A protein has these predicted regions:
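A conserved glycine-rich beta-strand in the N-terminal activation segment of trypsin-fold
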Residues: 20-24, 29-74
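Flexible, gly/ser-rich surface segments that form the specificity/activation loops bordering the active-site cleft
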Residues: 90-138, 143-149, 164-176
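C-terminal cap/linker of serine protease catalytic domains
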Residues: 19-25, 88-91, 165-218
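C-terminal motif of bacterial Sec signal peptides marking the signal peptidase cleavage site
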Residues: 15-16
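Active-site loop architecture of trypsin-fold serine endopeptidases
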Residues: 45-47, 62, 68-71, 110-118, ...
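Conserved active-site neighborhood of the chymotrypsin/trypsin-like protease fold
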Residues: 56-115, 209-213
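Terminal peptide-recognition signature
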Residues: 36, 50, 56, 60, ...
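Sec-dependent signal peptide recognition
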Residues: 1-10
Length: 218
């Protein structure tokens, strides 16, 4: 299995996109995520997307500054946080991504409307070396735009297989020699279900053990 080592992500924090996304007003897209905004000391300055995980918690990206109600940050330092957020009715079903399957990346745009991009999942894992988490993120080639960070990666069966982080610049970095991403139109990075499930297990253990709050954010 080939690893793409990277020292930065482009598009996750800064403005920009890596392709053309489309507005989507369908119920399935709009119901799969919600908007989150930064709180004090920079209220509403930053925006991201988030996905409901269960009745009480949702997940989004850690790199979005000052997100309120963060209950837990990834134990390895990966780009994931759990936030306190009550489910509004049903919450989505999750599963692991499958190499080669078609997906839809969903999230908000800077214009506060739902946007989507189509792509597929690739086998090559992505390592953000500057993060030092050691976690293997996943790759799809659907386009992303600022605001889609934390938004769902939807499989064709309606399950969510991960959440978007950002994109890797193939303009500045040649990855053509990596057979695991051959044919990819672009490299968009997402946190796969396996990492989210692992971190939920740790958070759940800490919640069940009042003496073990090492990883729970205060």
């Amino acid at each position: 299995m080939i690893k793409i080592m990277a020292y930065f992500l482009i598009g996750a924090v800064t403005a920009g996109c890596n392709g053309i996304v489309k507005p989507d007003f369908s119920g399935s897209a709009n119901d799969s995520y919600f908007l989150v905004y930064s709180g004090f000391p920079a209220p509403y300055l930053y925006m991201a997307s988030a996905v409901q995980w269960n009745d009480d918690y949702a997940v989004t990206t850690r790199h979005t500054p000052f997100i309120p109600n963060v209950k837990y940050s990834c134990s390895t330092g990966c780009d994931l946080v759990f936030i306190l957020h009550k489910a509004n009715g049903r919450y989505p079903s999750w599963r692991a991504p499958r190499v080669g399957e078609s997906i839809t990346a969903v999230g908000a745009s800077p214009y506060f409307m739902t946007t989507t991009g189509k792509g597929k999942v690739y086998e090559t894992p992505f390592v953000n070396a500057a993060e030092h988490s050691g976690d293997l993120y996943a790759i799809h080639d659907a386009p992303l735009i600022k605001g889609m960070s934390g938004g769902p990666v939807l499989a064709s069966d309606g399950h969510i297989v991960g959440i978007n982080i950002g994109f890797y610049s193939t303009t500045l970095n040649d990855v053509s020699n990596h057979s695991g991403v051959k044919g990819a139109e672009r490299l968009s990075i997402f946190i796969p279900y396996s990492i989210i499930q692992r971190e939920w297990g740790i958070l759940q253990a800490k919640l069940d053990d009042p003496h073990g709050a090492k990883y729970v954010a205060k």
